[in-house]
């Protein structure tokens, strides 16, 4: 499982011109599911995202300006967006190969479980719409982007 996380000032997801999910300051997390992923790896990924320290610590003078707080500590939102393209193999040729991505029906079920788990761990969770052609709007803060992997 891979997740591209971004520290954002704002992020939203729209489908057919209708906003389906939005957050203010927080983390926009694109989630890519692979063949070997399961509920346990999904839970590990959510736990990692929620505790990954990518926000500045301006409360402690000794840590001023250092990324030392996680999304929960700053009271930010979490926007989860399914994105199978994160599983692409790009090392050969000029076209991505998506054979590592989980089949859509299985991925939809696992992504729903991932979202459900996230909502049990944190209050401010929003999502896109699985399988839809989504328009994602974000104001990246920093920019700070990290590619997380869980096996």
UniProtKB/Swiss-Prot annotation:
The lineage of its organism: Bacteria, Pseudomonadati, Pseudomonadota, Gammaproteobacteria, Moraxellales. Belongs to the DTD family. Keywords: Cytoplasm, Hydrolase, RNA-binding, tRNA-binding. It is found in: Cytoplasm. It holds the Pfam family Tyr_Deacylase. GO terms for molecular function: D-tyrosyl-tRNA(Tyr) deacylase activity; Gly-tRNA(Ala) deacylase activity; Ser(Gly)-tRNA(Ala) hydrolase activity; tRNA binding. A motif (Gly-cisPro motif, important for rejection of L-amino acids) lies at residues 142-143. One of its GO terms (biological process) is D-amino acid catabolic process. Coiled coil: none annotated. Gene3D superfamilies: D-tyrosyl-tRNA(Tyr) deacylase. A Gly-cisPro motif from one monomer fits into the active site of the other monomer to allow specific chiral rejection of L-amino acids. An aminoacyl-tRNA editing enzyme that deacylates mischarged D-aminoacyl-tRNAs. Also deacylates mischarged glycyl-tRNA(Ala), protecting cells against glycine mischarging by AlaRS. Acts via tRNA-based rather than protein-based catalysis; rejects L-amino acids rather than detecting D-amino acids in the active site. By recycling D-aminoacyl-tRNA to D-amino acids and free tRNA molecules, this enzyme counteracts the toxicity associated with the formation of D-aminoacyl-tRNA entities in vivo and helps enforce protein L-homochirality. This is D-aminoacyl-tRNA deacylase. HAMAP family: Deacylase_Dtd. It comes from Psychrobacter cryohalolentis (strain ATCC BAA-1226 / DSM 17306 / VKM B-2378 / K5).
């Amino acid at each position: 499982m891979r997740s591209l996380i971004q520290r954002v000032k704002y992020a939203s997801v729209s489908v057919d011109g209708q906003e389906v999910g939005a957050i203010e300051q927080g983390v926009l997390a694109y989630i890519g599911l692979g063949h070997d992923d399961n509920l346990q790896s999904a839970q590990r990924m959510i736990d990692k995202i929620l505790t990954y320290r990518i926000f500045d610590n301006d409360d402690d003078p000794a840590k001023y300006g250092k990324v030392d707080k996680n999304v929960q500590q700053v009271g930010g939102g979490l926007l989860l967006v399914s994105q199978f393209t994160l599983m692409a193999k790009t090392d050969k040729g000029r076209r991505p190969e998506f054979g590592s991505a989980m089949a859509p029906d299985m991925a939809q079920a696992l992504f729903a479980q991932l979202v459900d788990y996230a909502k049990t761990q944190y209050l401010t969770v929003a999502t896109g719409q699985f399988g839809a052609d989504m328009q994602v709007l974000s104001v990246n803060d920093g920019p700070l982007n990290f590619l997380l992997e869980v096996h």
